[in-house]
């Protein structure tokens, strides 16, 4: 079963690590879509899992922009 990264784990990452994870997830999604189009994709569920991971990362980034949560090590 393909499982994504829980939000609480993403909240523990720094902004740079989140950006890196986001870039990697977008690359993986591109590759999965390409495999799906060519009929080589064996795990269709992985597409949805990666999409949800991207959404979670965007959510954590937005929470920090709004001040709803802080990056680890940032004590206010």
Curated annotation (Swiss-Prot):
InterPro entries: Ribosomal_protein_uL29 (IPR050063), Ribosomal_uL29 (IPR001854), Ribosomal_uL29_CS (IPR018254), Ribosomal_uL29_sf (IPR036049). Gene3D superfamilies: 1.10.287.310. It holds the Pfam family Ribosomal_L29. One of its GO terms (molecular function) is structural constituent of ribosome. The keyword Membrane does not apply. Keywords: Ribonucleoprotein, Ribosomal protein. GO terms for biological process: translation. One of its GO terms (cellular component) is cytosolic large ribosomal subunit. The keyword Ribonucleoprotein applies. HAMAP family: Ribosomal_uL29. Belongs to the universal ribosomal protein uL29 family. This is Large ribosomal subunit protein uL29. The lineage of its organism: Bacteria, Bacillati, Actinomycetota, Actinomycetes, Mycobacteriales.
């Amino acid at each position: 079963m393909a499982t994504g990264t829980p939000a609480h784990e993403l909240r523990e990452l720094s902004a740079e690590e989140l950006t890196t994870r986001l870039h990697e997830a977008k690359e993986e999604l591109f590759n999965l879509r390409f495999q799906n189009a060519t009929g080589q994709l064996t795990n269709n569920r992985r597409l949805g899992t990666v999409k949800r991971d991207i959404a979670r990362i965007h959510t954590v980034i937005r929470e920090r922009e709004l001040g709803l949560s802080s990056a680890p090590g940032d004590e206010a």
